[in-house]
C-alpha cells in the first residue's frame, strides 16, 4: 500500500524582485523519479493551524523534513515543522529528517545543537561496517540528543550522523541522499521504507 508523504520546503527568494517562495531542490525530484516514487506532496510554509486540514485533505501519513538553512532562520518553517511533528507524534506517522530535518526532530524533543567545523562541502566516514563515506553540508550538529533516540551512526570526530526514535517510526541523517548520484543502496532502502508501507 502506498503512502502520501508531505515534504517540507525552504524559503527562497525570486530573482529581480521581492517575493518569498517555498521550494525544494530539484535533486529531490530527480531522486524520486529514479526510485519511481510519486506519492508525495510539497508542504508549503502555511500557518500551523491549517496543517491538519491540509494533511487530511491529501491523506498524508508521513513527513520528509528536508535540509537547508539553520533552525530559527525561518520561524514560519520552524513552526510548521513543529506542528507536523506534533501531528506525526499523535498519529504515529513516519518521519524522515535530512540534515536540518534531523536537527529539527531532535529539537522537537528538547535536543540542542552546536556549531561544528569540518562538515561543510566534504565527505567523511560513518561508523558502519561497510566503511561508508557520506556527503556533508552542515555547520551545526546535535549537541544533546534526547533519551528517546538512539544513535545509529557517528562520524570520525564523534558527531552524530544518524538517529532513530526508540518508539516512533522516525529516522534522521545528516547527509543528503538526494545529492549522491547514483543513490547509495542504504539510502535507497531508507527512502523506500518511508514512501512504501
Label every PLM stretch briefly.
Residues 133-134, 171-175:
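Active-site-proximal beta-strand elements of phosphoester/diester hydrolases
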Amino acid at each position: 500500500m502506498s503512502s502520501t508523504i508531505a515534504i517540507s520546503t525552504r524559503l527562497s527568494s525570486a530573482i529581480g524582485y521581492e517575493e518569498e517562495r517555498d521550494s525544494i531542490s530539484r535533486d529531490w525530484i530527480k531522486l524520486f523519479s529514479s526510485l519511481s516514487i510519486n506519492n508525495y506532496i510539497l508542504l508549503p510554509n502555511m500557518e500551523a493551524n491549517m496543517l491538519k486540514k491540509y494533511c487530511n485533505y491529501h491523506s498524508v501519513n508521513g513527513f520528509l523534513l528536508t535540509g537547508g538553512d539553520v533552525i530559527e532562520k525561518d520561524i514560519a518553517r520552524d513552526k510548521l515543522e513543529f506542528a507536523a511533528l506534533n501531528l506525526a507524534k499523535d498519529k504515529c506517522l513516519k518521519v524522515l529528517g535530512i540534515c536540518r530535518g534531523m536537527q529539527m526532530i531532535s529539537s522537537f524533543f528538547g535536543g540542542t545543537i552546536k556549531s561544528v567545523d569540518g562538515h561543510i562541502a566534504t565527505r567523511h566516514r560513518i561508523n558502519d561496517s561497510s566503511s561508508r563515506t557520506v556527503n556533508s553540508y552542515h555547520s551545526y550538529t546535535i549537541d544533546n540528543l534526547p533519551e528517546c533516540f538512539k544513535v545509529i551512526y557517528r562520524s570520525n570526530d564523534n558527531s552524530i550522523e544518524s538517529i532513530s526514535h526508540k518508539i516512533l517510526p522516525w529516522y534522521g541523517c545528516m547527509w543528503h541522499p538526494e545529492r549522491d548520484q547514483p543513490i547509495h543502496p542504504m539510502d535507497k532502502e531508507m527512502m523506500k521504507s518511508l514512501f512504501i508501507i
